[in-house]
């Protein structure tokens, strides 16, 4: 089949969504399909752009291209999953969360005022109307499925996929550091992890890896480490190569991933591919679908002292990191998270 993958992109910004689209394209091509990513630019600030983008998405025609008929359209992101097609399935990374669970919070630019309520309703109504055009709706996790059911009463099926370069992760050992890899962003809660290091009793260190969304976020984080006098306990890597990242995973004691209500979270899968326990929080969303508390990681309250307790428990035990890490890899294999399964479902 000739398949179009519809998504959006903020120019010069790249992350998990771009990884997913590229890897889905490769998976489809590897299995005999023709596939192309159709990406449209997106900005939600100022807020009037939201409505413009929705209207623009409805004006595209993807039934044909100069190459011929397009057999299937797979919609990935708001509002590109509104693009019309007679044979469309949606595999939603997430909805526009600023209008849903993040509305009127520090994580959203839509507030509980006349302007915010207007654009929230625009998004609600568009999702309710246009998502139902799809022949089938999938999401990337049970967390996203639950949100869609809660806010829109739209049913969907969770369809898990592997993290990028899954086959390149490996395990070497369990050295005395906890690894935290995420872009530096308020929703990833690096500040909470830093604060937790005040309360650790073990000698374990925290390695933070990731580029900041902006200079302010990075400067704020580094200033906080300095303010708490934790420079000897925390190491920050602004940039690492892929090979360096694999090695950091391979030798970590465990992996910390405590985002606020994550949709999916490649970091969980990267840790499990590397045979590492995952320390996550009770409100972290996606990771909770993979982590079993006390078996292949810890699920803790999102407080500094509880996170520190988990650090110390795994750091002070001789064998716990290895035992949990082994269980982590085994659990991932049992879940059959594979591109074969994804392609089979999306193209059936």
Protein language model annotation of sequence segments:
Residues 218-240:
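Nucleotide-activated donor-binding/catalytic signature segment of Leloir-type glycosyltransferases, i.e.
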Residues 170-188, 194-201, 206-208:
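Conserved donor-binding/catalytic core segment of Leloir-type glycosyltransferases
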Residues 260:
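Aromatic "clamp/platform" in nucleotide-sugar-dependent glycosyltransferases that forms part
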């Amino acid at each position: 089949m000739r398949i179009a993958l519809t998504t959006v992109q903020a120019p010069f910004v790249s992350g998990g969504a771009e990884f997913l689209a590229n890897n889905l394209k490769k998976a489809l091509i590897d299995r005999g399909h023709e596939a192309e990513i159709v990406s449209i630019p997106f900005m939600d600030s100022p807020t009037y752009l939201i409505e413009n983008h929705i209207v623009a998405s409805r004006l595209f025609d993807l039934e044909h291209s100069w190459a011929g008929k397009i057999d299937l359209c797979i919609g990935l992101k708001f509002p590109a999953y509104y693009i019309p097609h007679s044979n469309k399935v949606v595999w939603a990374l997430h909805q526009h969360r600023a209008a849903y669970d993040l509305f009127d919070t520090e994580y959203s630019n839509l507030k509980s005022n006349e302007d915010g309520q207007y654009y929230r309703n625009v998004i609600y109504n568009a999702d309710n109307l246009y998502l139902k055009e799809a022949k089938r709706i999938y999401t990337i996790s049970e967390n996203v499925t639950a949100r869609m059911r809660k806010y829109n009463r739209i049913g969907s099926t969770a369809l898990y996929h592997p993290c990028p370069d899954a086959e390149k992760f490996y395990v070497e050992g369990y050295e005395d550091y906890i690894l935290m890899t995420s872009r530096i962003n308020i929703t990833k809660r690096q500040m909470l992890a830093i604060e937790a290091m005040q309360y650790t009793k073990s000698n374990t260190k925290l390695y933070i890896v990731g580029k900041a969304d902006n200079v302010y976020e990075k400067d704020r984080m580094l200033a906080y480490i300095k303010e708490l006098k934790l420079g000897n306990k925390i190491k920050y890597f602004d940039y690492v190569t892929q090979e360096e990242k694999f090695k950091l995973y391979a030798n970590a004691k465990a992996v910390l991933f405590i985002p606020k209500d994550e949709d999916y979270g490649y970091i969980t899968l990267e840790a499990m591919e590397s045979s590492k326990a995952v320390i996550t929080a009770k409100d972290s969303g996606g990771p909770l679908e993979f982590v079993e508390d006390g078996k292949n990681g810890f699920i803790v309250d999102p407080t500094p002292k509880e996170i520190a307790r988990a650090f110390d428990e795994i750091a002070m035990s001789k064998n716990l990191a290895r035992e949990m890490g082994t269980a982590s890899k085994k659990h991932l294999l049992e879940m059959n998270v594979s591109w074969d399964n994804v392609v089979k479902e999306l193209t059936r």
